[in-house]
Amino acid sequence: MNLKVLREEARSILLDIVERSAIKKGQLFVLGLSSSEVLGGRIGQHSSLEVGEVIVKLILEELSFRGIHLAVQGCEHINRALVLEESVAEEYRLEIVNVLPSLHAGGSGQLAAFKYMKQPVEVEAIAAHAGLDIGDTSIGMHVKRVQVPLVPIQRELGGAHVTALASRPKLIGGVRARYQPDPIRK
């Protein structure tokens, strides 16, 4: 796999989702990543640290530049816990849990997050404002309600199916109510 092409395609997908999700500075963005799927394999079967590092490093750089906080979801072997910066966990009052990811328990994305983040910690759950799912990892449990599906500009990254979610406030009040404009569904 050409890692330069992978990086550029991941960047294109990410920037599309960041723009259309209307995520703001200081908000949380969740990444679910199966490097096995990116390489054309079955989720959890052929994890690649190299692929995880390329994707996570890129996403962390792009989001950090915009002041958006990245949380990287792990696999079911660690109950889909998330890696993020300790300062973000404190800011959002998230309970830190004790687990260290490995290639087959947490995955390559989490290992990369531990490598590239300044003070990485694990938390059990978040309510992110938006997220990107590379390889059908099921990020929905970590995106706040009301979730709005976004179809990425490119639906595959390598061999992995790519989906995304944004979120918006609930619309309440019924037929007489009026609402603020929806920045996601312009």
Swiss-Prot record:
Pfam families: DUF436
Family: Belongs to the UPF0340 family.
Record SUPFAM superfamilies: TTHA0583/YokD-like
Protein name, per record: UPF0340 protein SEQ_1951
Domain of life from the UniProt record: Bacteria
Signal peptide: none
